[in-house]
Amino acid sequence: MLISTVMTTRRDALAAALALLTEAAASAQAQKGADPSTVFVHDLPNLTMDDWQVTVSHVPYAPGRVGQTHHHAGFVLAYVLEGAVVTKISGQAERVYKTGEMFYEAPGATHEVSKNASSTEPAKLLALIFARKGDTLTTPGPATSAH
């Protein structure tokens, strides 16, 4: 699986990442001929962001692709660019997210299910992973301790 990644360490990384997501959401809305609207609202962890960075990854899902159980050191904002993705994060119900929808993963939460909802169409996800500099971003398997 190919994942393209861009990293930044500037203090305005959060603002830049949210601007990127806003642009992606606005583009998806414009293609549908609708007015811009709120796509996602979620409280973020109480943290300072000093010595943190954001990593933006493009995650393609081939038809029928099933990802492995994993967790992240930091928190994740994920935006579905194309298709539909089935996800289940520890403590939550399994859910299908379609083009233009987003979800949040708390630091250390286990991503139990991550798969393409279609066996015939591809899906694409844009993942913004916010973590401390030097942390391993994605670790296979369930989290063994709370972060």
Provide a role label for each language-model segment:
Residues 108-135:
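Ligand-binding loop in jelly-roll beta-barrel domains
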Residues 34-68:
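A short glycine-rich, His/Asp/Glu-containing loop-to-beta-strand
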Residues 66-68, 86, 103, 107-116:
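Histidine-centered metal-chelating micro-motifs
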Residues 2-21:
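N-terminal secretory signal peptides and thylakoid transit peptides that target proteins
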Residues 91-108:
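Short acidic-glycine-tyrosine-enriched beta hairpin
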Residues 74-91, 101:
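Glycine- and acidic-residue-biased ligand/ion/polar-headgroup-sensing regions
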